[in-house]
Amino acid sequence: MGKYRVIAGQNLYDIALHIYGSIEGIVDLMMCNTDLSLDTTLKVGDELIYSDEFIINADVVAYNEMHGIVPSNGEHHVYPKVFTKPLAVAFALPTQILSVQCSVSGVGTLEIDWGDNSDTEVITLTDKPQLLKHIFDNKVRKRRRIRWFTDAYFKQVDWSGLQPTSVVILRPLPIEELTIKDATLTLDSLQMVTGIYSLNLSGLTSGNLKPLVECRELMTLNLTDARIKPTVLDDWLIAMVERYGNRRNCEVTLTAVPTGTYQEPARNADTGHYNITSGMEAIWVITHEESWNEGGKWKFIINDKEYSV
């Protein structure tokens, strides 16, 4: 007699096809395992006894062995998933990812569609961050998608473990502290995040930081080890001066360095306005404009060197 160990996603028919080359092999499985029935729910690691010299279709068995195929179809949803909250965020992930995780805290309810055959996961948010882990039960040919349905208020959110290639926020989303580390992303959707005062984008790869200009409530911005061109930093910093408006003072941490010299820029002879030509000049203006530093001082930390007044 042989022993067969069940793997993820397998049902009784998968195992019969793998061992005997035909689903008719379930008869032998139930004869060898008297407590087994068509209603039995198999779990990963379960062991089944089978007649090791009994094969119904040798060609199928040989083909599976030759191509390394292990039947694993599992159970699939027949009916659409139902959600009670509005669609708030859509993520796109690389196809090769097998498992993900994220953490959340706040007030309200979050419904997650993991984009596979699993049921909707419903999370009641609490003040303490909850680590959510998921192993995908299917394969996809194109990008994998995850959807969040919620109208909750989030205190802390960490999307780093999702490894997203795209984040699309579809409605105003209140988040106090957001972390997305080591991601390659466009940041346009961050304009839909409200009430955010701490943003950790360390390790970010992006070709445009201008969407950050609209994050006016930020008090902490971490861009450590971000792979960003100096000219991209320049465009963001200059745009922030030009569209400063009503915003909080912020502590910005960088390892990439903007162009230029930290000095007062020249003024336009006609208007008297600064003619800013580099990112470092923009930082000088931000840190030296008195009205922008009344409630608290702006601080830029670039490779451990502090620029402030």
Feature locations, PLM:
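Cell-surface/extracellular proteins and modules involved
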Residues: M1-E111, S118-G203, G207-T224, D235, ...
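C-terminal low-complexity, glycine/proline- and small-hydrophobic-enriched intrinsically disordered tails
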Residues: A226, E242-R243
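Membrane-proximal C-terminal cap and juxtamembrane stalk of leucine-rich repeat ectodomains
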Residues: R248-V309
